[in-house]
Amino acid sequence: MRRAETIEKLYLDFDGFFASVMQQAMPELRGRPVGIIPFETSAAYSTSVIACSKEAKAAGCSNVMRVPEALDLCPELVLVTQRPDLFRRAHNALLNEITCEIPIETVKSIDEMTCSLDTSAIADPAHLAQNIKQRIKNNIGEYITCSIGFAANRFLAKMACKMDKPNGVTIWQPEKMPGPLFALPLSDIPGVGKKIERRLNAANIWSIADLWDTQPKHLRSLWGNVNGERMWYALHGYDIYATPTGRGMFGHGRVLPPNWRDRLHAQSCSRLLLTKAARRMRREGYFAGMLSLWIKMRQGRWSDSLELPSVQDDHACLKALTALWDKAAKHLPLKAEILRVGVTLHRLSAAHARQLDLLENDDEERQRCEVLSTAIDALNRKFGKRVVTLGPWTPPPGGYAGGKIAYNRIPSAEDFW
């Protein structure tokens, strides 16, 4: 484990990414408080603001806030329906511009990324930050801004990035540490939520200064895992990287518009979501051993899972989904108002590691279904749109099912077919 002696990492976070992209694309929104809602509906009061502009944040609004609450805080709030494909294209265009100044090391989410610094960037990080900002302004637009942090490692650079938002630059040279940290509350440390903060307080750790002086093994015991110890080393400027994890699941969820909250419409939506999840799974070369269905109602929640014989074709996935809905029908209230539905394919195995069950998933029917799904995928890719589907395909109002606004997953163009 190595402790950096100079700044080595850049962390970039776009300011109010979704709303600022909309303001750049729609001049009539510029300078106005904007709230992004998940779908176009005449009953906007029944939904939530899922992202908002800096003008809306200045008025007290926040991401994931009920529309009535947001309008109480900011009566001038302009509600705009999300445009995930626009966000995807903006993300790709912005990455291209940043890459012209410095190679991108890791894309953390649709609006955050990290870079390793070369000798010229280490010598003059402020100049690099200014070049990135100017390139974005000149080639993309002035309404999309970013905040940039420089530090010894990625963890500290992320914290520095949050210090001067929006459109700021913060440089934490190792020789100046830990001074800048001590002015921050514990909750500003990535990974310290309310539960962990309560544990720290119970151990008489009330500030980052207290945390700094705590032994790393003690933090490991307070966290209950190695993350507490890793966090201590990251705060102290060590080059810490988490062990890469494999793909765990493919899934989609959808908030249903008011006129789609009956069981038949919810089932139709889940069918579409599952087809898209299965298509993503095939694209990445995985098979699933379990399907889960979850339903959020005004009257409560219901969820269940069904084992699968290591499959990836639409026919097998949709057959299992029908079985889960048949089970759900026995438990849901007769007139259940379903607010949200979701599906998850998990217990994944890569194609090269797939264990076949000779009785269930290696017969002629299964092979035909897999060939059929692969052929459908190829046709849709060839024509660049959805030309063939297995059964009915009726997206819910608002569109973008399976291609929704995303922080931790950047949709591909195929997710919008």
Positions of PLM-derived features:
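A residue-level signal for conserved active-site and pocket-lining positions in enzyme catalytic cores
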Residues: 13, 60, 70, 111, ...
